[in-house]
């Protein structure tokens, strides 16, 4: 998705999977101190000459459990015309009023360009994951993303289990509320 004409700006405490993805992409790589919006803004200013800029962050930082400042990140992305990629693997299913993750919690769902998550945590599948994005991004990934091209499809029972979990979450917030109370 990103080329050597682009830049990716990653939170320093992102999950290892994001860090490895950043290392593998051809874009110019930048890091900002965890949650430091002033440094993120500086990196956005420094990379204004790039074709595309993408801010990459976890939704929930797994080691400490605190949330990325998605409202502020999205404001900066709008101001500097950057894309926002959120890995919400540690939030899908229970963060946000209806469990739709950190973008829902911060009211910025429509401002997230690429959302990734797993089916192996709160969504109950045990393996697999997904990317949600605009159709043009999904189409590009289906054609160019080597991990997608050279992997197997998720097993139908896992999809069935995840579908059931999503039905349960849509029908009631009781499970999510219990997690948040604890």
At which residue positions do the language-model features occur?
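Conserved PLP-anchoring active-site segment centered on the Schiff-base-forming lysine
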Residues: 1-16, 182
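Pyridoxal 5′-phosphate
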Residues: 2-3, 33-38, 53-59, 94-96, ...
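Short, structured coil segments at secondary-structure junctions
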Residues: 4, 24-26, 80, 110-111
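Short, small-residue-enriched loops and turns at beta-alpha junctions
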Residues: 16, 38, 59-64, 91-94, ...
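Active-site-proximal loop->helix
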Residues: 16-25
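Active-site phosphate-binding strand-loop segment of PLP-dependent enzymes
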Residues: 30-86
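Active-site C-terminal subdomain of aminotransferase-like
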Residues: 80-83, 90, 95-182
């Amino acid at each position: 998705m990103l080329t050597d004409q682009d830049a990716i700006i990653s939170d320093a405490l992102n999950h290892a999977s994001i860090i490895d993805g950043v290392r593998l992409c051809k874009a110019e790589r930048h890091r900002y101190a965890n949650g430091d919006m002033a440094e993120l803004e500086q990196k956005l200013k420094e990379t204004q000459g790039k074709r595309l800029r993408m801010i990459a962050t976890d939704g929930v930082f797994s080691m400490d459990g605190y949330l990325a400042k998605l409202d502020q990140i999205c404001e900066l992305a709008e101001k500097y015309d950057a894309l926002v990629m959120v890995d919400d693997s540690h939030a899908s299913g229970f963060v946000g009023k209806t469990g739709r993750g950190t973008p829902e919690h911060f009211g910025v769902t429509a401002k997230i360009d690429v959302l990734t998550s797993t089916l192996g945590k709160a969504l109950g599948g045990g393996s697999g994951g997904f990317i949600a994005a605009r159709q043009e991004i999904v189409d590009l990934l289906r054609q160019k993303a080597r991990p997608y091209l050279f992997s197997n499809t998720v097993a139908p029972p896992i999809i069935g289990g995840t579908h059931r979990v999503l039905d349960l979450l849509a029908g009631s917030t009781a499970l999510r509320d219990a997690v948040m109370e604890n």
